[in-house]
Each structure stands twice: as structure tokens, then as C-alpha cells.
Amino acid sequence: AVVMTRKEIELLCYLLTHRGQILSREHLLKNVWDSNGFVLERTVDVHITHLRKKLGQYGKRIVTKSRYGYLFSV
């Protein structure tokens, strides 16, 4: 069984809902994280890294688009 944090699940669901679309770190922070608090953009990168590891071979579907953000490839 794969154990994920609530935020990892929320991020994965958001990526899946918007699969095929490039989503910037800023966009992900606004839509997945609580915008009331201060959150660093690096937080997205860390969560993406954890998701990729936990998804194993399927983690490769989360693609980094340099200087743009991330997308879940279909």
C-alpha cells in the first residue's frame, strides 16, 4: 500500500483533473495550498518529488516543463 499525505493526494488529484495542461508552481500554490499562509514555491517541487517516488513507475507521468511548471502526461 502507498501512504500519502493529504496534501500529496490533493496535488495528485489536481494534476489528474488538469492532465495534459502545464501548471505553473504559482498556479498550483494558489489552487492546492491555502493561500492565506506563506508557502514557498519550492514546496511544490518537494511534493512533486515525493509523489513521483510514491507512484513508482507511474511517477514518470508527472513531467517537469523547465521554467513553466508541471503536467501530468496522458
Stretches found by the model and what they are:
Residues 69:
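Alpha/beta-hydrolase active-site loop signature
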Residues 72-74:
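C-terminal edge and immediately downstream basic/flexible tail or linker adjoining helix-turn-helix-like DNA-binding
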